[in-house]
């Protein structure tokens, strides 16, 4: 696409420069939408501008704790998409502020501005009765959105993987230096979902191609935490021991580590790891959206190859050695 229609629909993607949000932005831009990318530091989100033609994708100042900035980004939009989430709290960015109050503010502002559609990216495991702050506030955010938009589409992905993920990348980086990969709750089940598939589902919802309701998004396979680590190690060709840490010990570690500025583990995260993170039986999902999700085996190699002993040249070096022997 080299030109943009004068009457192109407008999407306000709050969190549009984040891991999932940037792919949502790309998906909408490819479909001819104008996209306002809501973020706290627009000058650090200029990388989104080339996702479309000149003027199609623009970073816009938006703080989920500020009513005025949310109202501004929603004004004149055809769809508001909330794609903000955190794994640990920092300062004023608490779970309640970001995952419960933020969606509530966005939905109220969108409704006041006459926005037709609202899409919330939540997470599998959202539960108002959960003792886990992450899961509880995700559910509270969903309820707040549905109070304003009963016709909203809520997407609950399992763990999301892709080039910028903080799952495979983090553990692959650890494998560079550590002979052991420690995991808390090694038997916990996940249903990894490709970020591009989540973005495709979001775009369909924004365009009115998804019925109202909650969709649980999981990939085609279910794996234990330990199996995912073994898959990652096979891709990066490093032999490491995957050491399973019992949940009670993990909680103690989380209590200590969560005091760090950028904690690798928190007590809340350990609580989440005590439960499987897979699509519920009977839940609406990708099939209802006409999407066939991709498995991680065929994708993670494309971005984890840099963690191999010789990086992208590992295959070339091994082939040369094989010919010499």
Task: Map each language-model feature to its residues.
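Conserved beta-loop-beta element that borders a ligand/cofactor-binding pocket
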Residues: 122, 142-166, 173
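NAD(P)H-binding glycine-rich loop region in Rossmannoid oxidoreductase-like domains
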Residues: 42-105, 109-112, 124-128
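Mid/C-terminal beta-alpha module of Rossmann-like enzyme folds, strongest
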Residues: 2-5, 201-268, 280-325
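Residues forming the Rossmann-fold NAD(P)(H) cofactor-binding site
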Residues: 21-23, 100, 139
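SDR active-site strand-loop-helix element
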Residues: 14, 38, 83-84, 118-124, ...
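N-terminal Rossmann NAD(P)H-binding glycine-rich loop of SDR-like oxidoreductase domains
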Residues: 4-33
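Conserved glycine-rich Rossmann-like NAD(P)H-binding loop of the short-chain dehydrogenase/reductase
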Residues: 33-43
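Substrate-positioning beta->alpha
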Residues: 105, 166-167, 185-207, 212-216
């Amino acid at each position: 696409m080299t030109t943009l229609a004068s009457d192109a629909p407008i999407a306000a993607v709050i969190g549009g420069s984040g891991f999932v949000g940037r792919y949502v932005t790309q998906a909408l831009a490819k479909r001819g939408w104008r996209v306002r990318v809501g973020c706290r530091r627009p000058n650090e989100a200029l990388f989104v501008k080339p996702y479309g033609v000149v003027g199609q994708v623009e970073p816009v100042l938006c703080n989920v704790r500020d009513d005025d900035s949310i109202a501004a980004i929603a004004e004149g939009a055809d769809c508001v998409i909330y794609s903000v989430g955190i794994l640990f709290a920092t300062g004023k960015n608490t779970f309640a502020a970001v995952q419960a109050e933020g969606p509530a503010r966005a939905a109220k502002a969108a409704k006041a501005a006459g926005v037709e559609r609202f899409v919330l990216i939540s997470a599998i495991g959202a539960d108002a009765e959960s003792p886990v702050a992450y899961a509880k506030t995700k559910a509270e955010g969903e309820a707040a959105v549905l109070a304003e938009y009963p016709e909203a589409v809520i997407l609950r992905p399992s763990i999301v993987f892709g080039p910028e993920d903080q799952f495979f990348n983090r553990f692959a980086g650890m494998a560079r230096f550590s002979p052991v990969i420690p995991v808390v709750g090694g038997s916990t089940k996940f249903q990894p979902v490709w970020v591009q598939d989540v973005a495709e589902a979001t775009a369909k919802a924004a365009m009115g191609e998804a019925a109202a309701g909650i969709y649980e998004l999981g990939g085609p396979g279910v794996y234990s935490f330990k199996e995912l680590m073994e898959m990652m190690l096979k891709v990066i060709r490093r032999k490491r021991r995957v050491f399973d840490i019992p949940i009670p010990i993990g909680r103690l570690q989380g209590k200590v580590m969560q005091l760090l500025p950028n904690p690798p583990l928190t007590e809340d995260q350990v609580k989440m790891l005590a439960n499987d993170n897979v699509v519920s039986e009977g839940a609406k999902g990708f099939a209802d959206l006409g999407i066939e999700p991709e498995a991680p085996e065929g994708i993670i190699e494309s971005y984890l190859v840099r963690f191999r002993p010789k990086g992208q040249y590992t295959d070339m070096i091994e082939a040369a050695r094989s010919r010499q022997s």
